[in-house]
């Protein structure tokens, strides 16, 4: 297979998480359907409507990638995941729902410079510590 025949696309986004049970419960509570129950808590896969979200223990993911497990930073790591909604009201409702489920609201819904409407919440199950 040549490099030209490889179709560029993301099929799985994997998050290294500090607490698998808590992370699995959190993403299920947001309404994402879990795929492949046979894996138990070793890894969790969620259907996100095209791309799969995978949760994997932080240290195991570092080991699998062949990189040292560094201390978990408490600052922004340069990655966000977008959840597109149909309206501003739906964005606000999604943010409120996430906060009710234990996340920290980082930025309430507001107009963006690029013509959208967005907000941010921090998934505390991905990292240990305070946001």
Positions of predicted regions on the chain:
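Short connector loops at helix/strand junctions that flank enzyme active sites
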Residues: 48-50, 74-78
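N-terminal beta-strand motif that seeds the catalytic metal site of vicinal oxygen chelate
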Residues: 1-24, 36, 78-83
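Core segments of cupin and vicinal oxygen chelate
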Residues: 14-62
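Short amphipathic alpha-helices within nucleic acid-binding modules
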Residues: 26, 89-95
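Short, flexible, mixed-charge acidic loops at enzyme active sites
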Residues: 59-72
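Residues at or immediately preceding the N-termini of alpha-helices
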Residues: 20, 88-89
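Residue-level marker for the onset of beta-strands and adjacent loop->beta junctions
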Residues: 11, 41-42, 79, 105, ...
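Vicinal oxygen chelate
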Residues: 2-6, 95-131
């Amino acid at each position: 297979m040549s490099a030209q025949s490889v179709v560029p696309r993301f099929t799985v986004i994997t998050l290294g998480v500090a607490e698998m049970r808590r992370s699995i419960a959190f993403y299920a509570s947001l309404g994402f359907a879990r795929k492949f129950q046979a894996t138990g808590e070793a890894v969790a896969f969620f259907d996100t409507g095209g791309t799969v979200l995978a949760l994997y223990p932080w240290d195991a993911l570092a080991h699998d990638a062949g990189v040292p497990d560094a201390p978990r930073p408490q600052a922004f790591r340069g990655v966000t995941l977008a959840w597109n909604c149909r309206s501003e009201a739906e964005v606000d409702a999604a943010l409120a729902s996430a906060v009710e489920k234990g996340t920290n609201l980082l930025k309430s819904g507001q107009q963006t410079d690029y013509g959208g409407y967005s907000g941010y919440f921090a998934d505390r199950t991905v990292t240990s510590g305070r946001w």
